[in-house]
UniProtKB/Swiss-Prot annotation:
EC number: 3.4.23.-, 2.7.7.49, 2.7.7.7, 3.1.26.4
Organism from which the protein derives: Saccharomyces cerevisiae (strain ATCC 204508 / S288c) (Baker's yeast)
Predominant place of localization: cytoplasm
Residues covered by region (Integrase-type zinc finger-like): 583-640
Gene designation per UniProt: TY1B-GR2
InterPro entries registered for this protein in UniProt: Aspartic_peptidase_AS, DNA/RNA_pol_sf, Integrase_cat-core, Retrotran_Ty1/copia-like, RNaseH-like_sf, RNaseH_sf, RVT_2, TYA
Residues where Mg(2+) 3 binds: D1610, E1652, D1685
Reactions that this protein is recorded to catalyse: DNA(n) + a 2'-deoxyribonucleoside 5'-triphosphate = DNA(n+1) + diphosphate; Endonucleolytic cleavage to 5'-phosphomonoester
Domain RNase H Ty1/copia-type: residue ranges: 1610-1752
Subcellular compartments: Cytoplasm; Nucleus
Name of the protein in question: Transposon Ty1-GR2 Gag-Pol polyprotein
Phosphoserine found at: S416
Amino acid sequence: MESQQLSQHSHISHGSACASVTSKEVHTNQDPLDVSASKIQEYDKASTKANSQQTTTPASSAVPENPHHASPQPASVPPPQNGPYPQQCMMTQNQANPSGWSFYGHPSMIPYTPYQMSPMYFPPGPQSQFPQYPSSVGTPLSTPSPESGNTFTDSSSADSDMTSTKKYVRPPPMLTSPNDFPNWVKTYIKFLQNSNLGGIIPTVNGKPVRQITDDELTFLYNTFQIFAPSQFLPTWVKDILSVDYTDIMKILSKSIEKMQSDTQEANDIVTLANLQYNGSTPADAFETKVTNIIDRLNNNGIHINNKVACQLIMRGLSGEYKFLRYTRHRHLNMTVAELFLDIHAIYEEQQGSRNSKPNYRRNPSDEKNDSRSYTNTTKPKVIARNPQKTNNSKSKTARAHNVSTSNNSPSTDNDSISKSTTEPIQLNNKHDLHLGQELTESTVNHTNHSDDELPGHLLLDSGASRTLIRSAHHIHSASSNPGINVVDAQKRNIPINAIGDLQFHFQDNTKTSIKVLHTPNIAYDLLSLNELAAVDITACFTKNVLERSDGTVLAPIVKYGDFYWVSKKYLLPSNISVPTINNVHTSESTRKYPYPFIHRMLAHANAQTIRYSLKNNTITYFNESDVDWSSAIDYQCPDCLIGKSTKHRHIKGSRLKYQNSYEPFQYLHTDIFGPVHNLPNSAPSYFISFTDETTKFRWVYPLHDRREDSILDVFTTILAFIKNQFQASVLVIQMDRGSEYTNRTLHKFLEKNGITPCYTTTADSRAHGVAERLNRTLLDDCRTQLQCSGLPNHLWFSAIEFSTIVRNSLASPKSKKSARQHAGLAGLDISTLLPFGQPVIVNDHNPNSKIHPRGIPGYALHPSRNSYGYIIYLPSLKKTVDTTNYVILQGKESRLDQFNYDALTFDEDLNRLTASYHSFIASNEIQESNDLNIESDHDFQSDIELHPEQPRNVLSKAVSPTDSTPPSTHTEDSKRVSKTNIRAPREVDPNISESNILPSKKRSSTPQISNIESTGSGGMHKLNVPLLAPMSQSNTHESSHASKSKDFRHSDSYSENETNHTNVPISSTGGTNNKTVPQISDQETEKRIIHRSPSIDASPPENNSSHNIVPIKTPTTVSEQNTEESIIADLPLPDLPPESPTEFPDPFKELPPINSHQTNSSLGGIGDSNAYTTINSKKRSLEDNETEIKVSRDTWNTKNMRSLEPPRSKKRIHLIAAVKAVKSIKPIRTTLRYDEAITYNKDIKEKEKYIEAYHKEVNQLLKMNTWDTDKYYDRKEIDPKRVINSMFIFNRKRDGTHKARFVARGDIQHPDTYDSGMQSNTVHHYALMTSLSLALDNNYYITQLDISSAYLYADIKEELYIRPPPHLGMNDKLIRLKKSLYGLKQSGANWYETIKSYLIKQCGMEEVRGWSCVFKNSQVTICLFVDDMILFSKDLNANKKIITTLKKQYDTKIINLGESDNEIQYDILGLEIKYQRGKYMKLGMENSLTEKIPKLNVPLNPKGRKLSAPGQPGLYIDQDELEIDEDEYKEKVHEMQKLIGLASYVGYKFRFDLLYYINTLAQHILFPSRQVLDMTYELIQFMWDTRDKQLIWHKNKPTEPDNKLVAISDASYGNQPYYKSQIGNIFLLNGKVIGGKSTKASLTCTSTTEAEIHAVSEAIPLLNNLSHLVQELNKKPIIKGLLTDSRSTISIIKSTNEEKFRNRFFGTKAMRLRDEVSGNNLYVYYIETKKNIADVMTKPLPIKTFKLLTNKWIH
């Protein structure tokens, strides 16, 4: 601040009668914030140095020829307040005072310029430069020494300097603000010193060294009046001048007093922060020093609490005191007094054993720390020290403090307290000395050590007849068993261990000895005055000294509390070692270690563990007998009680004695379980259970939420049920303290009904054991039932209810009765019960047609509460019904050896149990149903393996002509309904409803076979069947080929070589050749089974002949054909070898669907298959390593089973609920804080670079006038909403430079301080890629620019203040912002508006509509990304012209001008671009990935081989619960964020081939299982292996008259969680890939065609926007094309038949697509699936296919 103030006024010139001298203005780059606490002590010195180093330009200091020419006073120096300046004159040292120098009655009448009146003023000579201050000037405010009377300078030395050489005086600067007055006073005092007036400056006591003369008073007044205008004076100065306007001395005196106080505070803070203590000085002196500093700071308003003070003290401890850092740092309530207690004890022990010579040597294997216990009757002291360092500091202590601890030749001056060796110290409490008084032992101020004891001292006791001491270190000639009886004042015996001599070595160098008794059982060390008197020593309490009768002073006495003390340092230590002293003890208990000490020493272990460890010698140095165990049993350690606090223990059976008085149904336990996630809306998410205490009867009720009204309804129901059914009244309900139970609504309800709520205590779930155990039991049963039955999870509550019914009927081992028996109910009739999930057939009493089947397959759940029926789940209708019209599905097969639940049945047992129930299906109906069952619902594989000796035709009762099995073998099996013993589908539609309503009348007759050439799974080979089969003929078609289908399955005549379609092997009987079944995609299966309504791509009836294929509409005109050829010609599509068309025989058309059995979510999707993979032999290439599709046992009959939901893979769920106590996920931080980059940075070179960057940033902030430097604001005066924190962040840029940035904490910015409507725009990546593509095709020059500190060019409109960073130490000050600082919410928008306005108005650019940050004119295109600019132009001079205009306003740096005709390399927004005009452009990130990927800690190349694809089909992500602790979970989530973040950045920039894998793994960031991490590692590994790959562009043919913009679309149907489809699009401009997108469809599609329509609808808007951009940047005509491999989608888009739009949403979407295609001249064409490069966006592909689709555009 001061140097800044000086620089602002350094242009003041010295005007005189003989010269006009001007000084060069000095600019400074000092950071106004950089005033940290560490620099306070240097502040005055730095201020003086700044004054002394101000220089002038030699050329401007020349003196005019006429020495008597008077120049006018500069305008910057205002005239005196009482009038203008009179005629000026000058004076030299060798001349007499002029006439104007005489004293006048009023000082304002003096006719001279004040600084010319200084006795030290000299005019400059003709050839001399402007005078400078001496380079070394003492600080004017330094504390005076006792010898010098002047505070600031020695006048005699100044006079001698004045006689030897001329000294020129510069005037002080002008005062411009009241806040600058303290700094101005310093410069003014310096001015007086240099003017030889240092003697009149007041000292610290307020009085000057000499009397001020009248002339000097006049000079003082006038200079003060001129350079300190009254309007800028502080209030307290004005108050002084209002009393006496000439009392400048009083102002100076008070200013010095204030400055001294500030300096003292700064010095105290620095001293406290740099404390050092190793025992070389007395502990009481160190304590006095510290406590005085703390007291002074507290008195001055700087509060230092105990925690901070203790930390500062402990940080400075060294030597034997260092261990206190580790023994004390865990204590939360530690005080300074307690810390000094241990310091005094160690010092006392250290001094006592300084000269002792131990008579034992420690074994090196002994423990490092030696523990000693010092017992005290008031408070024991426990000391732990290192005996190996006992005498290390001996010589050092003696030299530093003249304290002798040796018996050999003590010096005369040892331990003397003299003024010459003691520095003065200031104390601020009642025990302190006056200013300048010396510190003596009689005035030591101590804190309480133990009660009122003064550590390290002996208490002078006039009533004691003997001297007693607790420590044996000072006893000479000790002897044990003295036989002396000693009693205290209360007549209690004091056991004496030894007697000896106590030897004193006083400061007069005399030695004295008295008798002393040793005992550890006293509170103080007592020194008997009677025994001192016996050796001619008395205590004088008036002088506070011990003296002899002749008046010789021996030692000072210290008064502490109510007693007088003498220091132990006058005692001579004995030569007795510690073990010898222990042998002197006679009491066994006094020689043992106290248990509390051992307990604390051994990490607070319990007494039993410690005793066992000592007994087994696992702890050495002392034995079990060395510890006093008497207090171990009853000892309560407060730290253990706090640190090891646990919940109270529950005694088994303790609950019963409180509830014996209750009758049945009077005492209930209740609890709520939930929520269960990822369920349809109709399914309950919670259940509430009730248990009767007496009978243990249970009730469960489903809940959809935990609202008060929902809970109240259940309570009302259960209370009414108990009252009416059991004639009982509930008296007490026990529950936990959840908000659902403690709300006011339920509390009032219970109070109204007279029920007492009994709540558990806080966090005591074990007290609620009855309800908790019931919930656990029911959930265990639920999981088991769902696993056994295979039913979907949304039926979980049905399993709970089934378990409740059974559990109420089972007897308890304790009571020998069931809950139903205790309640007086009959036992459960098991004949009415079915196994949970038992397959049944339910009668459809209201079919659509008389010829439709009457049976619907379902699963039995539990008996109905409201009827005599059974609750049965019908998957095909997605409903549950309450009915008695059902029949159990039976079968004889079972495979107990494999424990196959799907085959395991107990039909005979079920028949016996249900014998009394008659089936609604007649015997002839059973036979008839079996005859119609032409498609088996069994797993072919399992059927053949179960009965190899008797193969059974599972397709039909008829026998194949080629089947060798006689028809009679099937007769017995055909008499009963075929068993459908399979698992139910795991997942169903989320909109499934649970109701008791049977299917409605309006239903589709049969499932519709959809387009066989489906593309959702990657496409199939074209089959020789109708693509759009008529719905009315589908049944006939299937029926007519039943026998053919059957014949095919049992025929050996079919050869694998007849088709290229993927075949699945099926085991045959008796060693016959394997039969093959063509693989049919899951999409086809779903269409055949699920869809009841007409297919969206259904067309009018056509001939069923396999030779008639319905063609897709194609362009009929020659122009359209040419356009199609033109669009497809330049695309980077794969080159495929020609293949001959293959037709499947008719039997293939009627094969039942075969589903892939999958239990996990697939990385590649559900049931993905690929059209490019052909299996013509048993051997398979490594590149075609697809997972082999197996025949599913879950295949259901599509005719008789009525569209049962096919099995699907499990949902991919982010099971965050399984993670225990996850609170927050911290974002990833890539920058460093100030303390990390500079303060604690151990890398010196890096630290220096960051410091350099820091100063560079500070200078830039000052240069840009980022804030108002004229005023600092008090934090209390500003609205907190407008105050924003700030910080410095540091990072290393990609080019290796180190960057520092001063930013605001916009993340905590208040919403009222910015306009949320303003947006910060940057160039879209598609816009940049489009511009680069056009630049290549048109031979443009590409120039890259950077604008330094861009945001700081934008002004800020709002009134905002920032708080300086913490490391600057200005916590209470604020600065008002003037510029848009980085980090503010509005900074980006302000900069965007600023640069946008400049580009439009000054550079003649215009922004492209719809594409922010893209500007153009007739010659130049600009892409703006914050402060980076990319210029495109055909003429390089046009770019240079824009650069010249930008440099007029902004600090613009040219990164790459782009003028070379050779290959030029760019780094544009992370893309490494190689560009040669007119030839090619390559985009990659090799250097960046080479640097970043190794830092991710991913194991690269673990097997030493490179991956060929980022993933493979057939990989599935398990949904097992993620049991992991919070810290590990956060760590893994952070790792996933880093890995997926980098992958997303790379994929979005140019690696579009990775987007599908990135998108899929990004959905699992919050589910970081081991499997997910491994898949992510594999993706990063592939990126590492292919880091050198580049997106290759070549210049378009010059003959092309048009720009061609193409979007290639693809979709993968239902391969994402919740049956969502994956859609993908790739965009190409003139054959160059400029962008790609892979995402999950926002809505659930019900067919492949719908998914394709959704994908196309996502591509068209962006295609139109890109078309507009291309037309704006390049005036060529443009052709827009859209390619898809779905012919049905093209047919619907081009069709005018609105009947195809069979549902509201997709019908509307398809109609909109049709309008957009026709209205935007968009060409839609078909592309073969094999050539669809967008396939990589929607599914995982085999290596061969992946390479085939990508090697044309990225390699």
